[in-house]
Amino acid sequence: LDVDAAVSVDRPVFVNYETSVFYSPSLGGVNSSLNRYVDFNIWGICAVGSSVYVMATYKVMPSYIYLSQTTFSLGNPTILQFYDSPVSLKVNRNSLLAGSKSCDCLYYTCEDGIYYWDLKKQLSTTPVISIPVGMEITSLSMNPDGTLLYVGLHEKEGTEALKGHLYVYDVKTSTLISQYHNIADKPVAIIYKERA
C-alpha cells in the first residue's frame, strides 16, 4: 500500500492523502475507498465502533467542509454534513482524534485546543478545552464506554524529571474530572485497563 499515515485504532485505517484513498484490513485482504473521496482533501479520519468518520474539504472549493461516515468495508459513505464554512477547517493531518459511540461525538486537537464535534451537527469553530500554557498534547483517547476523554500532555520546559501529565474529561460536558501531574516522561498512548 502507498500510504502517508495510519489511524491507530483496534482496526487500523491507512490513508494516502495525495490520492484521497484510504484502506482498511479485512479477512480477504484490504478494503479500499476507491475513488469515493477523489474530489476531496482528507484531513482527518476517526474510527468509532464499526464506523469510520471522515473530515475533508472539497478540492474545487476548499471552504466547503465534507463530513461523512462509512464502515470498515469502506462502501459508499453517508454524507453527514456538506457546507460552506465561514472559517477554515481546524483539523489537520497532525490532529489527534478520539470518538465516542455512546455520545455520538468526536474530539480532535488543533494548535489552540481541543474541539468537540457532535456527529449530528456542523463542526465547532472554537475549542471546548483549552490547553495550559507550555503544554503540548501528545495523546488523545477514551475509555471503552466512551464516557471519559484522556488527554496526555507534555510540558517540554517543565522543571520536574517527569514532564508528562494526564487530564481526564467528561465526554458529554467537556468538564475536567481529574488531573495527574508528572506521571510519565512524554505520554504517547493512554490505555484504559479494567480492574479484575
PLM features: residue spans?
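Repeated scaffold domains used in trafficking and secretory/extracellular systems
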Residues: 1-10, 37-49, 82-101, 134-142, ...
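Long, acidic/polar, low-complexity amphipathic helices and coiled-coil-like
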Residues: 1-30
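Hydrophobic beta-strand positions that form the internal "hydrophobic ladder"
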Residues: 12-13, 52, 106, 149
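Recurrent small/Gly-Pro-centered beta-turn motifs in extracellular repeat architectures
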Residues: 14-17, 55-58, 110, 151-155
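Structural motif
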Residues: 18-24, 60-70, 111-118, 157-168
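Intrinsically disordered, low-complexity segments enriched in Gly and acidic/Ser/Thr residues
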Residues: 78-162
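Blade-level signature of beta-propeller repeat domains, shared across WD40, Kelch, NHL, RCC1
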Residues: 161-196
